[in-house]
C-alpha cells in the first residue's frame, strides 16, 4: 500500500511517498521532497507569503516525488495531508492541493495531525518502542507519552515554543534565515565561551520562554549586538573588569548570547523531560521536531538519559524537520485501520492538539 503525504503547516513544503508492504515488513521511504520558503534576514515568514510559496511549488514537488518514487498515480492508495496545527494560510493551501489531487486521481483523503506525524516518523526511523517524546519545533514544545490510545501531553510551553524563541532571537541579531535561523543560532553558539545569566522558568511540568526572550533581547540591545554586525570576532577583544576585584568578565559577544540562550532553554527541556520519564517509568527519550536536530540538545538529553540508565533517540534533518513523509507514514497507519477524511470534512485547523487524536493503530 502506498500513501502520498503533503506537509505545509509552516515555511516548509514537503511531499513524501511511503510504501507499506502487504507482508507487514518495515515500511519504505520512496520519496521525501522538500522546499523551504526563506525570508530575508531580520524578518519572519508571513502566512500570506508562505502560502503563496506553497501554491507555487506544490505541483512541481508532487511530480518530482512521483518520479523519484518510480510510481504512477494508479499505484497510490491514499492522499494524506496536514490538517493542523500550524499557520492558517499555508495549511489551507496544502488542504486545497490535497483535495484537488483527490478529485483528479479518485483517491481517498486522510487528514493528519502534524505532531502525531512527527512522533510516528520518529518511532519508525529510530525503532524507539514506547519513549517519552520531546516535541520541539517553531510552533510547539510538548513532553508527551503514550497511554490508552492517546499521545498524552505531560508538559508544554505556557507561551511561545522553543523554536519560536530561537528564531525570534535570530531576528534580533539579524542572523540569516538560510537554511534556518535556529540552525544558524546553533552554529554561532558553538563559538560562545561566556554563560550569561538568564531567567530559568519551569512550572512543574511546564515551561515558559517569553521572559527569557525578552531578557536576552534587552541584553543584546544593551551591548549593541542587535541588528547587523560587521564581524563577530571583533567583539571578543572587549574585556571589562568586574567590580570589587572579581575575575575579569568581558562584554558578551553574539556567540555568547546564543550559547547562553541554548544552555538555558535546553536545561529547562531536559528537566521537564526527566520528570516525565520518572512519572511513566520510561528509560527512552525520543526527540522530534525541527529543534530536535540541534546537537547540543541531543547531547544534554543524552547525559540525563544515561544517568538514568536510559537512551535518547533522534533523527537527522531529513526526518526531524517538517516533511511530507511523516504525514504519509501517520496517514497510512490511520488509513489501514479504516480511517478516512470525507471531502466535505477535509478542512484544516490551526489548533489541533496532539491528544485529540485517537491512536487506533497502537495497542
Swiss-Prot record:
Cofactors required: a divalent metal cation
Q: What is its EC number?
A: 2.3.1.234
* Transmembrane segments annotated in the record for this chain: none
Source organism = Emericella nidulans (strain FGSC A4 / ATCC 38163 / CBS 112.46 / NRRL 194 / M139) (Aspergillus nidulans)
Record-given protein name? tRNA N6-adenosine threonylcarbamoyltransferase
Residue sites binding a divalent metal cation per the record: 114, 118, 135, 322
**Mind telling me which GO cellular component terms the entry cites?**
chromatin; cytoplasm; EKC/KEOPS complex; nucleus
Endpoints of the signal sequence: none
